């Protein structure tokens, strides 16, 4: 009944379509592929002939026949086709296996192909092409012959093609392509073509895309009748997924037992599909068949394609990648910073390196001095069992960057490093490490995405691995198996995933299985978290402390106090469960309760540390107590879980076993990694390449580091022998001693921390003090000590108590508020702000963390950044800064420029260095004084008057020589200018010039107080009184102050200062007397203020210089000056010397130059001007006061002060001279010094007579006495 389809194309088409339809009916497929199929196949002759008969004897055409439901064109043909495909018995299938058909496969252009035969072939043998006209009976042999003839025809004329026959090799190749590419016919065909090409087979034998598609559907239809689609496995799957999974499982079964399908094999096929593994008895052997975790199935499990890329093909990565390490928290930052290392680390690493090698490197790089000392001690004395754990109490962990997304990886077989690339090879078949056992553990259905929650197949199937959270979470033994097997390989990936953290498999190197707690914690962690953690409170924490905390563990390398307390506690409560103490909040105050809060924290900390949760306590022992407690509070769930897990790790492990896989989605894995990171153990088998892939091949690897207490790694029996505790205590004490920890400090911290409520204290006082302590504990380090010394200098006296409390030479890096003063009122921020820089830092002069200092900062620097002043690299030391009273920011007005002084603008001094300037306070004084002051306190009135006179004259000379004095007359501010100023208290940081009475006459009694030696800072009087000074800049030109009304001085002379005077006023020369030994004509005796000899600074020098015409047109000297009138005497004492009027010319003030000046903006320039009114207010400080806390150095040459020495007390002058000289030495450039020297020489050479004449000519005053006397 074979119907010969004529060669006529239409007949063939009809048959083809019919065949397709029949296939469609048979198949559940419903795919329309058949239509296309038919179209292509239409070119080939179909043999319906065989069909009817085949119905009788041929194997049923496998539903897999690609025919799609195309409408039947010839009803008889359609019917025949249907009969053929549906009726042909399976028994005949094998007969199609003959390889002979292979040749005919593609070649046969004319020979119609029996679909039934092909279908059968799909199951076992090749399909032989059947001659188009061949009767069914002879179809087989004739088909072969025809096949070959068809091949010839095909080559000669490609009009017809014979139905291809599929040899076993072809089928094997097809299934390989199917495993790899899934339902991608073109990719499968390319795979086959490539294989044939390699083997040198003719292109005619290569199956084309349509043939591949047909074979796919024929095979599928063949097996659909055996698949139980009602099973839960198939319910949630799309039809394409069912096909793919069914065909892949069938292909696996076919490999082992052949493609013959009978009831028995059908059952096994269903089992394989639904469970993922089955056992088949074949030829006397039991064969274990597992669903392959091939790429195609992974795509099903991981529709997002997370694992797609990495699976089969080796991934080529760059050889090296930049890596950036940042501290995970303040504790980590402080630890590295305290070592004078940069907490941010960038380096280029080779991807084939293990993460553990990176950790080891960092561990050595950032090893604490204390650790080295400890090692030495342990080598010598602590050889016993305890010593080893002690060393590892706090371990370095790396964590993925905060913003990176983590993707679990499939099992990595190996990472190969070559010259060009770093290549990551996946485990065979792209199988996840755990897949082997996991696959069975989880039914394929789940793998396929029924449990899509799991994430990538590897993540899912390999849950244990990626889900290491479940981490071996006690998977059932089989799972455990899988874990182990995968664990062996997976440790790498596991750690890589980090989710596994090696925890995934108890075997994982990270934690020896023996330590249930270690693994348990992880294992349990998931379950425990699910169960316990959420419900538990820290108080309720199971006693993780069952293992008494390791003191070492707790001992924060950084904070001596907690360590000390902990050690004491250890002694006190050696066998008690600390957790209990902590929970109740009742701690046994090791130090008489003072430390109780801290102790608590440590305890909880310990618990946390001990708890496998190490990560949650991450702050770990090393962290400040507050951090610990905070962690406890924050991560109570985790810690609790973990702690709880340790409590019952084994049980948890067992229980979670089944569910962990499901519980561990990729997100969970990522979270786990973020919580636990990688340490030396967990990352031993993890390469940076895996981390790189997990993070999605970023341009640079961003990792964070922290030190976590591996207490969890040390699950110790609940009660350790008391002897052990004692030993530990002793070792702790040794360590403390070795690290030079100051117990007093600890006590202070204790009391402080105790004072505050535990939570509050943790946040505020505890953290700061703890951190401070931590930092200070590093004292042994030399550089640190230096830093501390610097900081100590920096500490204001108020901070002194603090510093004394922190006796350790090293200063705390963090200024959490004065630790001793009471950190409670400090910001209380959780994170201390680093104040002290590493020893080599050029900011070594940072402001020291004294409470008072902070207050003053805040008060004074409200609107101004305090750092402008403090962080500038300045030589001067702000030792006495704390003395400074709150500074008032003064408004500075621009003086009205007077017409004649266009170029004198240079007379502003930029006080960038001055402490005041940063704050925006107006200060006409040379900041140089501050330096001097910092360098050494100025002793008021100590200098001999003659020195003062020296200074004055020297200053004048210097000013003139330096060109500071402008030729243009700058009217000296009238004494009136000083009148408004009330004397500043000695405390005030800025010395004020003693104010003159409003009348503007200087009274001898009013001599300006000298700057208090104690406060070297030169700054503007902080008092608001000064504020007006700026206002005074009434129309005076920038360079020259408006001519002040000449107020009668005591002597009755009005003192219009000559420009030279005014300029000198502006000058703030440092102690010139010290710099230069210049002998100038001595001042007239009457000029000496208050009878002190040579007090008056001869302005004559300046005037001489001016008269010489060096500095512009000569200005008539003020009569007071010439006469040696009181005005000259009224020179304000050095403290007053910084008379507001005086403005240093930029040339004179080194700060004027950008190099030293903080701010060269106009505002700063203007700030340097002082209006006469302000000057008045600024000047008056009682003579006697040493308070001239900060010299207004510039005012040494203050116009009034210089001209009228009278009002200035010699002591003041001496102080000023000294301070100013020091400033000049410190701040002024060498050029200036050399200028002064030159000036001195000139003066010495110059005719004294001429100078005197000048003086006389100007005012007829007595010649200035030689200052050098």
Curated annotation (Swiss-Prot):
Cellular compartments annotated: Nucleus
Spans annotated as Disordered: 1-165, 450-541, 581-666, 757-827, 976-1034, 1055-1092, 1115-1157
Ranges of biased composition (kind: Polar residues): 757-767, 774-806, 982-1002
Chief location: nucleus
Gene Ontology CC entries for this record: nucleus
Entry's Gene Ontology molecular function annotations: chromatin binding; DNA binding
Domain named SANT: residues: 161-224
Gene3D superfamilies, A to Z: Homeodomain-like
Gly residues biased stretches: 1-12, 105-123
Entry keyword annotation includes Glycoprotein: no
SMART domains the record matches: SANT
Compositional bias (Basic and acidic residues): 13-24, 43-52, 151-165, 508-518, 526-535
UniProt keyword terms in alphabetical order: DNA-binding, Nucleus, Phosphoprotein
GO biological process terms held by the UniProt record: pattern specification process
Biased composition (Low complexity): 124-147, 485-507, 1055-1070, 1125-1140
Comp. bias (Pro residues): 59-74
InterPro entries given in the database record: Cramped-like, SANT/Myb, SANT_dom
Signal peptide span: none
PROSITE patterns listed in its UniProt record: SANT
Residues carrying Phosphoserine: 307, 1268
Family, per entry: Belongs to the cramped family.
Record's protein name: Protein cramped-like
Protein's organism: Homo sapiens
């Amino acid at each position: 009944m074979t119907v010969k389809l004529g060669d006529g194309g239409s007949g063939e088409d009809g048959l083809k379509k019919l065949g397709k339809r029949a296939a469609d009916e048979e198949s559940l497929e419903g795919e329309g592929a058949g239509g296309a199929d038919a179209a292509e196949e239409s070119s080939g002759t179909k043999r319906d002939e065989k069909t009817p008969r085949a119905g009788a004897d041929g194997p049923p055409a496998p539903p897999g026949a690609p025919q799609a439901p195309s409408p039947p064109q010839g009803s008889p043909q359609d019917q025949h086709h249907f009969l053929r495909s549906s009726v042909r018995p399976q028994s005949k299938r094998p007969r199609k296996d003959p390889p002979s058909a292979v040749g005919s496969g593609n070649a046969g252009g004319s020979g119609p192909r029996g679909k039934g035969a092909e279908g059968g072939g799909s199951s076992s043998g090749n399909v032989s092409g059947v001659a188009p006209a061949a009767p069914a009976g002879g179809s087989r042999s004739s088909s072969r012959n025809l096949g070959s003839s068809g091949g010839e025809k095909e080559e000669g004329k490609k009009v017809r093609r014979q139905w291809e026959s599929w040899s076993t090799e072809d089928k094997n190749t097809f299934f390989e392509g199917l495993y790899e590419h899934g339902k991608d016919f073109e990719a499968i065909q390319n795979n086959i073509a490539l294989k044939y090409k390699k083997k040198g087979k003719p292109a005619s034998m290569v199956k084309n895309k349509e043939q591949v598609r047909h074979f796919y559907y024929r095979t599928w239809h063949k097996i659909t009748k055996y698949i139980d689609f009602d099973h839960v496995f198939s319910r949630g799957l799309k039809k394409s997924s069912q096909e793919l999974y069914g065909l892949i499982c069938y292909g696996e079964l076919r490999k082992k037992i052949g493609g013959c399908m009978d009831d028995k094999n059908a059952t096994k096929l269903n089992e394989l599909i639904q469970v993922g593994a089955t056992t088949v008895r074949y030829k006397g052997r039991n064969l274990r068949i597992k669903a392959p975790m091939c790429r195609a199935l992974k795509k099903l499990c991981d529709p997002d394609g997370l694992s797609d890329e990495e699976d089969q093909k080796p991934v080529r990565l760059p050889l090296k990648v930049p890596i950036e390490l940042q501290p995970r928290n303040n504790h980590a930052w402080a630890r590295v910073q305290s070592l004078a290392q940069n907490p941010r680390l960038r380096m280029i690493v080779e991807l084939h390196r293990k993460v553990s090698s990176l950790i080891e490197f960092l561990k050595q790089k950032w090893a604490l001095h204390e650790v080295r000392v400890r090692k030495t001690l342990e080598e010598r004395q602590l050889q016993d069992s305890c010593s080893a754990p002690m060393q590892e109490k706090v371990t370095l962990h790396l964590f993925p960057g905060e913003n990176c997304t983590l993707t679990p990886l499939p099992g990595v077989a190996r990472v190969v490093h070559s010259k060009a690339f770093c290549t990551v090879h996946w485990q065979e078949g792209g199988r996840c490490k755990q897949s082997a056992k996991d696959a069975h553990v989880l039914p394929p259905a789940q793998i396929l995405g029924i449990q899509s929650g799991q994430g990538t197949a590897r993540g899912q199937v390999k849950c244990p691995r990626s889900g290491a959270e479940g981490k071996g979470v006690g998977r059932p033994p089989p799972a455990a198996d899988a874990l182990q097997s995968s664990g062996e390989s997976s440790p790498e990936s596991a750690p890589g995933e980090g989710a596994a953290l090696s925890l995934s498999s108890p075997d994982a190197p990270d934690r020896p299985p023996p330590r249930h707690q270690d693994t348990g914690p992880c294992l349990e962690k998931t379950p425990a978290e699910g169960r316990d953690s959420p419900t538990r409170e820290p108080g309720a924490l199971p006693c993780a402390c069952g293992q008494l905390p390791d003191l070492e563990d707790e001992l924060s390398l950084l904070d001596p106090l907690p360590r000390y307390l902990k050690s004491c506690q250890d002694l006190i409560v050696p066998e008690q469960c600390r957790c209990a103490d902590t929970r109740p909040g009742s701690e046994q105050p090791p130090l008489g309760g003072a430390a109780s809060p801290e102790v608590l924290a440590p305890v909880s900390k310990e618990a946390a540390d001990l708890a496998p949760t190490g990560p949650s306590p991450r702050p770990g022992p090393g962290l400040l107590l507050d951090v610990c407690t905070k962690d406890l509070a924050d991560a109570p769930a985790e810690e609790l879980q973990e702690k709880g897990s340790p409590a019952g790790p084994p049980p948890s492990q067992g229980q979670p076993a089944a569910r962990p896989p499901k519980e561990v989605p990729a997100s969970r894995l990522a979270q786990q990694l973020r919580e636990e990171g990688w340490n030396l153990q967990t990352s031993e088998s993890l390469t940076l390449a895996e981390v790189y892939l997990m993070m999605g091949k970023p341009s640079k690897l961003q990792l964070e580091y922290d030190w976590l207490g591996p207490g969890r790694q040390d699950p110790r029996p609940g009660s350790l022998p008391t002897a052990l505790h004692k030993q530990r205590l002793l070792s702790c004490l040794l360590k403390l001693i070795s690290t030079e920890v100051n117990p007093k400090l600890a006590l202070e911290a204790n009391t402080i921390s105790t004072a505050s409520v535990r939570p509050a204290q943790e946040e505020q006082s505890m953290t700061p003090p703890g951190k401070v302590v931590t930092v200070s504990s590093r004292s042994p380090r030399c550089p640190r000590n230096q830093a501390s010394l610097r900081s100590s200098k920096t500490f204001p006296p108020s901070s002194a108590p603090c510093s004394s409390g922190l006796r350790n030479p090293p200063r705390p890096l963090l200024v959490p508020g004065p630790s001793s003063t009471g950190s409670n009122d400090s910001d209380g921020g959780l994170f201390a702000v680093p104040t002290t820089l590493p020893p080599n830092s050029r900011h070594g002069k940072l402001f020291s963390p004294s409470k008072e200092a902070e207050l003053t900062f805040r008060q004074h620097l409200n609107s101004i950044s305090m750092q402008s002043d403090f962080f500038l690299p300045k030589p001067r030391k702000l030792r006495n800064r704390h003395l400074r009273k709150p500074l008032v920011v003064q408004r500075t007005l621009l003086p009205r420029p007077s017409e004649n002084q266009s170029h004198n603008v240079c007379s502003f001094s930029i006080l960038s260095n001055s402490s005041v300037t940063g704050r925006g306070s107006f200060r006409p004084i040379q900041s140089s004084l501050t330096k001097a002051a910092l360098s050494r306190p100025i002793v008021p009135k100590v200098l001999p008057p003659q020195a003062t006179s020296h200074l004055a004259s020297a200053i004048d000379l210097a000013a003139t020589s330096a060109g500071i004095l402008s030729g243009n007359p700058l009217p000296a501010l009238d004494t009136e200018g000083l009148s408004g100023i009330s004397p500043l208290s000695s405390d005030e940081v800025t010395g004020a010039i003693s104010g003159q009475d409003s009348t503007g006459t200087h009274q001898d009694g009013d001599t300006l107080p000298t700057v208090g030696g104690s406060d070297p800072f030169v700054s503007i009087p902080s008092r608001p009184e000064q504020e007006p000074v700026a206002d005074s800049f009434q129309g005076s030109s920038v360079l020259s102050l408006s001519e002040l009304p000449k107020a009668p001085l005591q002597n009755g002379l009005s003192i219009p200062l000559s420009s030279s005077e005014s300029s000198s006023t502006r000058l703030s020369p440092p102690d010139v007397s010290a710099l230069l030994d210049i002998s100038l004509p001595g001042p007239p005796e009457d000029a000496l203020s208050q009878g002190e000899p040579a007090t008056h600074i001869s302005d004559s020098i300046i005037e001489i210089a001016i008269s010489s015409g060096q500095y512009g047109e000569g200005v008539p000297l003020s009569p007071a000056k010439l006469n040696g009138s009181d005005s000259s005497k009224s020179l304000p004492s050095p403290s007053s010397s910084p008379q507001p009027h005086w403005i240093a010319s930029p040339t004179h003030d080194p700060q004027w130059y950008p190099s030293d000046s903080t701010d060269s903006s106009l505002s700063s320039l203007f700030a340097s001007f002082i209006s006469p009114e302000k000057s008045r207010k600024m000047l008056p400080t009682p003579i006697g006061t040493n308070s001239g806390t900060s010299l207004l150095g510039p005012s040494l040459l203050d116009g009034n002060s210089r001209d009228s020495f009278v009002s200035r007390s010699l002591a003041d002058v001496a102080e000023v001279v000294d301070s100013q000289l020091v400033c000049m030495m410190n701040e002024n450039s060498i050029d200036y010094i050399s200028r002064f020297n030159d000036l001195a020489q000139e003066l010495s050479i110059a005719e004294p007579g001429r100078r005197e004449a000048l003086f006389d000519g100007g005012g007829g005053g007595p010649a200035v006495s030689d200052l050098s006397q």
